[in-house]
Amino acid sequence: MDQGGGASPVFSASAEIDGDHLRVLVTGEVDMATADVMFQTALREPAERVTLDLRAVTFFDSAAIHAVVRLAQHLPGALTVLPSRQVHRVLDISGLADQAWLRPA
């Protein structure tokens, strides 16, 4: 259902490495069709620090939550998640708002 009159948000996940820091920029809808791409993109390059930038994400479902939790398990102490308001709300409802890897929206 199109409520805004425009095209639906297109998913993308891109990674850029700067020294020991990997920044993964995710945009659009993260769902069961795209969550694994986000996960694999975040693990593509070895890095001591990984920032998962979700500030341009417009939809985030249970598959996306699962992918982020798996990333936190794969990258203990190295993951930082920058959420959009929608993503933060979903993670809050899911009981994950107090995780050390999650920054405020």
Predicted segments with their positions:
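STAS-like cytosolic regulatory interaction modules
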Residues: 1-63, 67-105
